[in-house]
C-alpha cells in the first residue's frame, strides 16, 4: 500500500480520529455581553444572540473566511439581555437565517426575554427546514450518552429547572472540531460544578473554557474545578481590557496560579 492508501485505510478504521479544520472566535461588542462563534469545517455556530456595530464587521468577516453565507446553528445560553438582545436577535435571524436555533428551556421573566422567545418561535414556524430546540431537562434526557473522544457535542445542563434563572443556563461542550469549547452561560451552582467534575469527558477534553457569568467570583469556579477540567485557555466575555470588573481578581488569580491564559 502507498501512503495515500494507508491514510485512507486508517480514516476508514478510525473515523472519529480525523483532523477537522476548526475556528473559535470571541467578539468584542463595545458594551457588556457575550458573543462567540465555533466552526468545525462544516457547521458554523453563533453562540449568543448579540450583534452590535462593533461586532458586526467581525462576524461578517468570520463567515466569509469560513465560506459561509448563513449561520447553521444559533445557540443561546440565557434569556438575559447580555446574552440575547431582542433587536439584535431579529437582525441575526433576518440576515443570516440560522437553520437551527437552540434556546433556553426555562421561561423568561423579563419583557426582553419574552419577546426573544416569541421571535424565535415565529421564525422557526415560518419555514419547514428551520428547527427550534428548547434545551430543557426533557430534551437532555432524550439525547444519547456521549462517547469518550468523539466528534459529538455534549449538553450537560439544565438537568432540572430551578428558581434561580442563572442556574438554568445551558451548559454545552462543543466538540465537533479538532479542539473543544465548554460554554457555561451564567451558572453559579456548586451542584453543576460537581456534575462536571464527575464527567470523564469534561475532565479530559476541554481546551477552551468560556468563563461562567463573565468571570464573576460567585463560588462556581474554584481551584478544584479548574484542576479537574484542566482548560488550556479561558475566555472572558466582558468586551476587553478587564472592563466591567471581569474577570474578577480572585478568578484571575486562580487561573494564573494554574498557568491558564486568560483571553
Each language-model region and where it sits:
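Core dinuclear metal-dependent hydrolase active-site scaffold
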Residues: 1-70, 131-208
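Binuclear metal-ion centers of metallo-dependent hydrolases, dominated by the metallo-beta-lactamase
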Residues: 2-16, 99-167, 233-263
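Divalent metal-coordination and catalytic microenvironments
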Residues: 27-28, 38, 78, 101, ...
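Active-site environment of divalent metal-dependent phosphoester hydrolases
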Residues: 31-32, 54, 78-84, 107-111, ...
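A cross-family glycoside hydrolase active-site/sugar-binding cleft signature
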Residues: 48, 104, 184, 212, ...
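Active-site metal-binding motif and surrounding structural segment of the metallo-beta-lactamase
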Residues: 53-103, 198-216, 230-234
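Stable alpha-helical elements in mature extracytoplasmic
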Residues: 55, 59, 85-88, 116-120, ...
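Metal-dependent catalytic neighborhoods of phosphoester/phosphodiester hydrolases
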Residues: 81-95, 111-121, 221-224, 247-249
Amino acid at each position: 500500500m502507498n501512503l495515500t492508501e494507508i491514510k485512507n485505510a486508517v480514516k476508514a478504521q478510525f473515523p472519529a480520529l480525523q483532523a477537522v479544520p476548526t475556528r473559535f472566535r470571541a467578539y468584542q461588542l463595545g458594551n457588556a455581553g457575550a458573543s462567540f462563534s465555533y466552526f468545525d469545517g462544516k457547521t458554523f455556530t453563533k453562540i449568543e444572540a448579540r450583534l452590535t456595530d462593533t461586532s458586526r464587521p467581525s462576524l461578517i468577516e468570520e463567515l466569509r473566511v469560513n465560506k459561509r453565507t448563513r449561520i447553521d446553528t444559533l445557540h443561546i445560553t440565557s434569556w438575559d439581555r447580555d446574552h440575547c438582545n431582542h433587536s439584535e436577535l431579529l437582525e441575526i435571524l433576518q440576515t443570516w437565517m440560522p437553520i437551527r436555533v437552540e434556546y433556553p428551556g426555562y421561561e423568561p421573566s423579563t419583557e426582553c426575554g419574552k419577546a426573544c422567545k416569541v421571535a424565535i418561535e415565529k421564525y422557526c414556524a415560518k419555514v419547514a427546514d428551520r428547527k427550534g430546540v428548547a434545551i430543557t431537562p426533557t430534551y437532555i434526557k432524550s439525547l444519547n450518552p456521549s462517547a469518550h473522544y468523539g466528534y459529538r457535542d455534549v449538553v450537560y445542563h439544565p438537568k432540572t429547572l430551578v428558581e434561580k434563572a442563572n442556574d438554568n443556563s445551558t451548559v454545552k461542550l462543543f466538540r465537533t472540531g479538532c479542539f473543544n469549547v465548554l460554554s457555561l452561560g451564567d451558572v453559579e451552582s456548586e451542584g453543576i460544578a460537581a456534575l462536571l467534575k464527575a464527567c470523564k469527558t469534561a475532565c479530559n477534553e476541554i481546551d477552551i473554557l468560556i468563563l461562567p457569568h463573565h468571570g464573576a467570583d460567585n463560588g462556581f469556579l474554584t481551584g478544584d474545578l479548574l484542576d479537574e477540567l484542566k482548560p488550556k485557555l479561558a475566555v472572558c466575555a466582558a468586551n476587553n481590557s478587564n472592563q466591567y470588573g471581569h474577570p474578577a481578581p480572585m478568578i484571575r488569580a486562580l487561573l494564573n496560579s494554574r498557568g491558564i491564559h486568560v483571553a
